[in-house]
Amino acid sequence: NIQIICCKHTPACCT
């Protein structure tokens, strides 16, 4: 999922 990858680069994206 794109969210998982985004979380790796930007934690704020994970929330």
Swiss-Prot record:
Is Secreted a UniProt keyword of this protein? yes
Query: How this protein is processed and modified after translation, per its record?
Result: Contains 2 disulfide bonds.
* Tissues in which the protein is found: Expressed by the venom duct. Is mostly present in part 5 of the venom duct (distal part near the pharynx), and less abundantly present in part 4 of the venom duct.
Q: What is its main location?
A: secreted
Q: Which GO terms describe its cellular component?
A: extracellular region
Q: Where in the cell is it found?
A: Secreted
GO MF annotations in UniProt: toxin activity
| Keyword field | Amidation, Disulfide bond, Neurotoxin, Secreted, Toxin
Q: Positions modified as Threonine amide?
A: T15
Per the record, the similarity remark reads: Belongs to the conotoxin T superfamily.
Domain notes for this protein: The cysteine framework is V (CC-CC).
Q: What is this protein called?
A: Conotoxin tx5d
List the source organism: Conus textile (Cloth-of-gold cone)
